[in-house]
Amino acid sequence: MGLVRSFALVIVFLSCLIAVYGQGTRIGFYSTTCPNAETIVRTTVASHFGSDPKVAPGLLRMHNHDCFVQGCDGSVLLSGPNSERTAGANVNLHGFEVIDDAKRQLEAACPGVVSCADILALAARDSVSLTNGQSWQVPTGRRDGRVSLASNVNNLPSPSDSLAIQQRKFSAFRLNTRDLVTLVGGGHTIGTAACGFITNRIFNSSGNTADPTMDQTFVPQLQRLCPQNGDGSARVDLDTGSGNTFDTSYFINLSRNRGILQSDHVLWTSPATRSIVQEFMAPRGNFNVQFARSMVKMSNIGVKTGTNGEIRRVCSAVN
C-alpha cells in the first residue's frame, strides 16, 4: 500500500508542477506524432544497461549537466573541439552511445520528430527505474539547442563546493535547498567518483591526516581504494554499499559521516540541510516523491519550445 500511495502522490505532484514549470512541455507530447517514442527510448536504455550498468548513473548525470548549462536543450550532446563535452567537468560523461542509438531508432520510426533533449530527459528517468528507483511521467516537447561551448560549463556544481556555493548555483535556476538535497542525493545514490576528488579529504587534511569530521573507521577503506600514490583515476562508489541501487542509503551514509565528496558531507553537517537528509533517510516514500518533483522542475530549466531551436537529425551535430 505504501508504494501505491507514493506513486499516487508522484502523479498528483506532477500534475501541479507541469502547470507551473511546463514552459510548453507536456506529458504525452508525442502521443500522436510518435506514439512509441517513450517505449523506444526505454527499450534502448534497458538494452544498453543490461551489458553496461554504468550507463544508468551516466545518463542521469549527463541530463543534470545538460540542464545546468544553457538549459535542457541537449547541448551537452554536441561534439566539437570546443563543445561542452570537452570541458573538464564533462570529459568523463558516460552514455552518449545510448542516446545516439535511441535517436537512430526514432529517426527510422518518426523522422524529424523527437528531439535529442527529450531523449536525454526520458533516458534519465528510465535509468532511475532500472536501478530500482520509482518512475515518473516526463513532460516532453523540448527542442534542441544549436550552441555548445566548453566555456559555458563553469557554473556546474563541484565536488568541493560548500553548501553556500551549491545553494547559489541551484538558486540561479530557481531550484531551492530542498531541490538541491534531492537532486544531489538522487545523482549520488548511484554511480562513482574518481579518487582524485577525495584525496585531500582522506590524506591531506590538517596535519597530513584525514578530515577529522569523517567517520574515522571508514577512512582506511577509502585509503585502500584510493592509495595516496595513485594516479587519482580509480573510482569509488558515491553510495558505499549500495552504489548500483537507487535508494535512500546515500542519506543514511551521510548521517554516519560517510559522505564521499565534500559537497555531500556538508549536506549533513549544515543545519540548513540536515533535517532534509533526516527526512529522506526513511525507506522510499518522501524521497522518491520529491525526486520526481525536483527532476521535473530541473528538466524544464531554459527549455526551447515552439519554433526555438531545432529537432536534430543526429544528436552529436546541428542540422
Swiss-Prot record:
List of catalytic residues: 65 (proton acceptor)
Catalytic activity, EC = 1.11.1.7
| Induction description | Transiently induced a few minutes after mechanical wounding.
- Write down the top EC class of this protein: oxidoreductase
Q: Which sites does the entry annotate for glycosylation? A: 204, 253
Q: Name one GO molecular function term.
A: peroxidase activity
Q: Which cysteines are joined by disulfide bonds?
A: 34-110, 67-72, 116-315, 195-226
Q: What is its main location?
A: secreted
Q: Which GO terms describe its cellular component?
A: extracellular region; Golgi apparatus
Q: Which residues form the signal peptide?
A: 1-22
UniProt binding sites for Ca(2+) 1: 66, 69, 71, 73, 75
Q: Which GO terms describe its biological process?
A: defense response to fungus; hydrogen peroxide catabolic process; response to oxidative stress
Q: What does the entry list as the binding residues for substrate?
A: 157
Which body tissues produce this protein? Mainly expressed in roots.
Q: Where is this site: Transition state stabilizer?
A: 61
Which Pfam families does the entry mention? peroxidase (PF00141)
Instruction: Could you list this entry's UniProt keywords, alphabetically sorted.
Output: Calcium, Disulfide bond, Glycoprotein, Heme, Hydrogen peroxide, Iron, Metal-binding, Oxidoreductase, Peroxidase, Secreted, Signal
- Positions contributing to Ca(2+) 2 binding: 189, 239, 242, 247
Where, in this chain's numbering, is heme b bound?
188
Catalysis: reaction(s): 2 a phenolic donor + H2O2 = 2 a phenolic radical donor + 2 H2O
What does the entry's cofactor note say about binding and number?
Binds 1 heme b (iron(II)-protoporphyrin IX) group per subunit.
Q: Which InterPro entries match?
A: Haem_peroxidase, Haem_peroxidase_sf, Peroxidase_pln, Secretory_peroxidase
Which cofactors does it use?
Answer: heme b; Ca(2+)
Which family is this protein grouped under? Belongs to the peroxidase family. Classical plant (class III) peroxidase subfamily.
Its function, per the record, reads:
Removal of H(2)O(2), oxidation of toxic reductants, biosynthesis and degradation of lignin, suberization, auxin catabolism, response to environmental stresses such as wounding, pathogen attack and oxidative stress. These functions might be dependent on each isozyme/isoform in each plant tissue.
What protein name is recorded for this chain?
Peroxidase 62
